[in-house]
Every structure is written in structure tokens, then in C-alpha cells.
Amino acid sequence: MLQYQIERIDHQIADDRSQTGTFLIGPLERGQATTLGNSLRRVLMGGLEGSAVTAVRIAGINHEYATIPGVREDVLDILLNCKQLSINSTNPELEIGRLVASGPMEVKANDIQFSSQVEIVDGEKPIATIQEGHNLELEIHVERGVGYRPVDRKSEETTAIDLLQIDAVFMPVKRVNFTIDETAVAEGGTGRERLKMEVVTDGSTSPDDAIAEAANQLIELFQPLATVTMVEEIPEEPEPSPEAQIPLEELNLSVRAYNCLKRAQVNSVSDLMGFSYEDLLEIKNFGSKSADEVIEALERIGISIPQSRTSV
């Protein structure tokens, strides 16, 4: 199997602490770059676990369309700013951060007090602007999850009236692009490919770690296929019907037909079900009249046999 190398050719950290990594993977057989690129992109964009703000409580506020006295931003703006926070929580359970601030003050993400298990990636992210003589109290809920989780309106009705739910985006990877370079040529002129992949994260994880986690998920997905053992199912023998157990004597056949069948080792209806009309005619001293008699007797108990034997 062709061995390829992975090289990170660029790594950048933006002002908002988001990270961009560019990777070159190759050489690959033709078609493998597309397979790798599509598989990694799908897991990177929707399969990685991340952290997100899921709810906010604002003192004195019980709905998202309100305004806060002495605060420049309305509630919707504050919720949006909280939703856009890049956060990394190592706690699988709910984490709650708190903020109590007095104006004049521009509240930033770093002003929110969390436990040591929560890291705010972009501490300079603005949250709200408080005017002099006014206060702002926030409670911010952070959870871990995968993908996108919209607000559940049914559960929202059972939560505290002042806890404002937020559509949660747990995806730590913001964008993935890849291109395929088909110019690489191996010895002997065989065509090769290289995969160039750009991964942009929100800063809560690095592009290197994101690709490693995506690859591990794909390995776990495909690993069972490598050890699949195909077990041939042996079909169960169908249970004979009650009619098949009827002895030959109970068909009330003529003495001639009965004796001919007995000499042919036919002792029950089950034995007769293996015969066709043509097979009956081949029994010694068994004519068409006797064959018709057998057919009629079988039909009386709901059993029919084919007119001719099945060709193999």
C-alpha cells in the first residue's frame, strides 16, 4: 500500500484567535485524494465535539426583546455576542459563568468568571457597554456537544422564565477547503495525487488536533469492517403442515391405488407431496384413473401437486 506523508505548510492565528492550518498530504493513488478530502471534511465540519454558550440569564430580564436600562446593547445583541464566544470547556457537564459589572464599562469576554475548566479563547470579544450609574448582571451557561442544537421550545417552556435559551453551535471548525494536485508523477510514469487541505478553527482547538480527531473518528468507523466475519445463515427447515402427517390409509383410496403406492414406499401425504402427476403415472401398475383418484383425495385436504416434474 502506498505510504503518504502529511506536512503542515502554513499556520496562522488571527486577531480573534481563530487558527488556519494548511496541510499537504501525498503522494496518493488517483482517486484517494477525493476520498480523503471528502471524508475528513465531513467529520471536521459536523463530527467534532466542541463547547458553546447555550443559555444566558440577565438580571431583571425575562424575554429576549427587552432593553436593559443603562446598557447600550439590547438583549438580542448581548445574546448574539455571547453566542459568538469561542470557548473551550473540558467539563462534560454544564458550566456556569457569572458577571457583575458597574458602569461606565465596556464588558469583554475576559470579565466573565468561569471555573478553571473553561477557557475563553478571545478574551477581547465585546459583550456589552454599561453607562455610568448602571449595573449589569449575567449568568452564562456553557455545555459541550456536537454539531448544531436549536432551542427546544418545549423544554424552554419548563425552564426558568428568565433563562434565555440560545441556538448552540458546538462546531470548533469554521471552514474546510481542499484542492487536488494531479501533477505528481511516480517512477515509471504512474500518476499520483496530492491533497491540499485548509482547516480554519475558532481557536478552541488547533487545526492539527482537529485533523487528528477527525482521522481517529474515521478509523473507529471503518475498523469493524476489517474484522467482519461473514456467517452463512443456514435456513431453517420448515415445519411440516398437519396435513402432511396424514397417513396414506386416511385418504380412502381404492385398494388398487393404495397397494401400488405402498409398494412404491409411499406411506403418508408428506411422501406424496414429492410426486408430480407424471411421477404417479410411472409407478408400476398405476394408471391415470388411480392418479386422478390421488389428485382428488389430496385436493380434499387442500393440497395440490404439479402436473409435471420440475426440470433441473
UniProtKB/Swiss-Prot annotation:
GO BP terms, alphabetized: DNA-templated transcription
Gene3D superfamilies linked to this entry: 5' to 3' exonuclease, C-terminal subdomain, DNA-directed RNA polymerase, insert domain, RNA polymerase, RBP11-like subunit
Summary of the function given for this chain in its UniProt record: DNA-dependent RNA polymerase catalyzes the transcription of DNA into RNA using the four ribonucleoside triphosphates as substrates.
Highest taxon of the lineage: Bacteria
Similarity comment: family membership: Belongs to the RNA polymerase alpha chain family.
HAMAP family for the chain: RNApol_bact_RpoA
Domain statement: The N-terminal domain is essential for RNAP assembly and basal transcription, whereas the C-terminal domain is involved in interaction with transcriptional regulators and with upstream promoter elements.
Catalysed conversion reaction: RNA(n) + a ribonucleoside 5'-triphosphate = RNA(n+1) + diphosphate
This protein's record includes keyword Acyltransferase: no
Region (Alpha N-terminal domain (alpha-NTD)) location: 1-229
GO cellular component: cytoplasm; DNA-directed RNA polymerase complex
Keyword vocabulary terms for this entry: DNA-directed RNA polymerase, Nucleotidyltransferase, Transcription, Transferase
Entry GO MF terms: DNA binding; DNA-directed RNA polymerase activity; protein dimerization activity
Gene designation: rpoA
Disulfide bridges in this chain: none
Subunit structure comment from the entry: In cyanobacteria the RNAP catalytic core is composed of 2 alpha, 1 beta, 1 beta', 1 gamma and 1 omega subunit. When a sigma factor is associated with the core the holoenzyme is formed, which can initiate transcription.
Protein name, per record: DNA-directed RNA polymerase subunit alpha
Known EC number: 2.7.7.6
Taxonomy of the source species: Bacteria, Bacillati, Cyanobacteriota, Cyanophyceae, Synechococcales
Alpha C-terminal domain (alpha-CTD): annotated span: 240-312
